[in-house]
Amino acid sequence: WEIKSFFEKCDSKPLVITADSMEEALAFLKQVFDIPELEQYRDRVLVFDKTEILPKIAQETTDFIVVAHTREVERELAPYCTMLRSIVVSPRNAARVKSDIVLEPLGTEPFRKALESMGKSRDDIAVLEKASGRSLTVLRRQLSNVPAIGTPEWADDSRIASDMVPLVLAGTWDAQNEADRTLLSLLAEVSSYELLEKRILNLLQLNDSPVWSLGNLRGVISKKDAIFAIKGSVSKADLYRFLEIAQIVLGEDDPALDLPEKERWAAGLYGKKREFSGVLREGISETLVLLAVHGKDLFGKHLGFDGELEAAKIVRELLMPLTTRKLEANNRDLPLYAEAAPRAFLNIIEQDLQSDNSEVLGLLRPVGTWIFSTCPRTGLLWALEALAWNPHTFPRVVNILGRLSEVEINDNWVNKPFESLSSILRVWMPQTAADQEMRVRAVKMLLDKHPVVGWRVCLKQMEDYGTRIGRYNYKPKWRRDGYGYGEPLMTFEKIHASEREMIELVLTRQTYTPEMLCDLVSKLHVLVLNDQERVWKIIEDWRISGAPDEDIAKVREKIRVAV
């Protein structure tokens, strides 16, 4: 309505529109003039790319609307401002006057709804949101198959690309945090952070600027977009300098763990906080994942750099020797460590669980219900959920979760190993890309190695249709493992086939305990008549095989109550 008001008032002052890029602002104008109420002005709009044309047309007529998107045309417009209606568009950070309309990056919900209307799936949207930072200018590049559009204009300037290298590797940081400032200076090889800040200010003035600044925070709009754009400007020294710094930042202990759990929420008041900011830790972790996933393609041929190998080294150095404190200190980072080095991460967890004094099991203690309490096992469970999407790591994750599920955790948190495991193997909404055959083999493995847990998993899948509740598990942020998977199955035949597999497993055990028989009785209502008869046959065979009277009494009471 700002534009409609502009035309109705006949104001001689230009309408100033700013956006991430001039192209985005021009696209916005195109959509605006397609609105029925403004169609009358559309045929009078002229977009000027070059100079010397505007004065010639203005001498003949003033019945047109000028759209200026370069400084040269804007200067040429100045003498004609009182005679012509004009719209000036410019990059948001380079605006020299107050903007009338500012096109900010979309919020999460509008962004997702817009992509849904384009037919994009939930996974497509998650990938594009992460890759674009919800910037429509970057999104256009991510969706384009044209190389000229897929590469940002600033990447053609080798000086700008070189200036971007340390910023892309860091990702996000706090400009008021002294430790962050020092680290960025080391990464950029400058004597003072102020020199780097000046570079950032210059980058902010660019059309389609690759960086952002909000309060004390600085960052790169799209790390993936930028790292591909600067690949030719990254040296081997840059990469190994980053790896050294990553070990320093991510290896920092969390002093808050020195406090009692009830007081950790106020760690800042006690001076128990890390030197490096949380946003920098996350940015460094994400870069580690990107180098692991894309490093060989980006830098392998001309630099001989193997990002996957280097990421695995870093993860091992950060976590070994494994302790409960290290796991808690890296709680939020564990999913990214697992994504960066899946095999190395699983090796570390498996070796620990095979030891007599497992440090991982220390995370499974009950969590208190006091205000601001946090769950120390969440990071580990998300890491394992992320690795369960890949069929290659799926069996190992199921085995690990089976072992963790043997530990009874008496608290009211939903984040428990068994919940993650049940969700991964859920017959109607499996949270893995592993096919049905692999999932059935995994359940059989659980019944063999962790029989109590395997039995519970089978029973969990035998639920009333009306009471079924599913949840989405954690997915990798940068790997495409699980891409296109995780939604409820739409074919009843597939669901029914998986259910039959679970039912067959519970009805064909070699031996049954009284507790198992009671479980079968409680599930009679979800079984077809033939399967119900099989349950009664199992109970009868168990009874005549010499079951103790007290066990028979227990099962009889369950039958009396449930049937």
Locations of regions flagged by a protein language model:
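Non-catalytic all-alpha helical scaffold/repeat segments
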Residues: 2-14, 19-56, 60, 71-76, ...
